[in-house]
Amino acid sequence: MNTFFLSLLSGAAAGTSTDLVFFPIDTIKTRLQAKGGFFANGGYKGIYRGLGSAVVASAPGASLFFISYDYMKVKSRPYISKLYSQGSEQLIDTTTHMLSSSIGEICACLVRVPAEVVKQRTQVHSTNSSWQTLQSILRNDNKEGLRKNLYRGWSTTIMREIPFTCIQFPLYEYLKKTWAKANGQSQVEPWKGAICGSIAGGIAAATTTPLDFLKTRLMLNKTTASLGSVIIRIYREEGPAVFFSGVGPRTMWISAGGAIFLGMYETVHSLLSKSFPTAGEMRA
């Protein structure tokens, strides 16, 4: 097994397991952020509505992220080391992980954004399945074109994902490295990696909630609207506090999800690396 398939399989297992376990919390978060509030958009009814689109996209999306992330960690580090030749090891590590995770997120969003559009519209419309929502988008009822409809909220998603991942992954890698060093190890066990992922994910989730809120509102719009006009309208009509709608479920979901997502990734990666020793070469 080569390093490409190692990252692909580890990422697929991580993404699918996380979405299956935490989908109801994601639905609650989406309905809290939707215009009209939680109960107007379905309350606790049908909290697994939209699961199909999430499951279909979770494996390829997570695989794309980890393939890109693991590849960039190895390939970018020599250049970053030269760029910061007088810098500390921690600065080089942090910069490497920020760049690698950002590239990984952009690649993953090629799959994730269309799936998010379908999923979130299904979560707030009580009569539609994921397939019916997708058919509605493909019919191009608003005449804006397939690309605009499927990738609605793309720029805002990237604006959310890059700050999120620039907080989560450098912190995650730092916590793992610090814990391993304290125990005289080169790497932490998968369960320790899961704890590090939970802490890093929770902090990143809470910090980037306003960006997630804006992404949700833009994706739920049936027509294209500029980010600036959406921010101004929401601020005037609903007040500044609404930008942190869903912060509780989002932080809880991503904190616990980070433990499963990164813990599963570490577990599968470790098992496959031991079974196929040459597959572990990409780890940085």
UniProtKB/Swiss-Prot annotation:
Solcar repeats: 2-75, 92-178, 192-271
GO biological process: S-adenosyl-L-methionine transport
Cysteine disulfide links: none
Transmembrane in keyword set: yes
Membrane topology: Multi-pass membrane protein
Extra remark: Present with 521 molecules/cell in log phase SD medium.
GO cellular component: mitochondrial inner membrane; mitochondrion
Pfam families: Mito_carr (PF00153)
Location of the protein in the cell: Mitochondrion inner membrane
Keywords: Membrane, Mitochondrion, Mitochondrion inner membrane, Repeat, Transmembrane, Transmembrane helix, Transport
Organism of provenance: Saccharomyces cerevisiae (strain ATCC 204508 / S288c)
InterPro entries noted in UniProt: Mitochondrial_sb/sol_carrier, Mt_carrier_dom_sf
Protein family per UniProt: Belongs to the mitochondrial carrier (TC 2.A.29) family.
Stated name of the protein: Putative mitochondrial carrier protein PET8
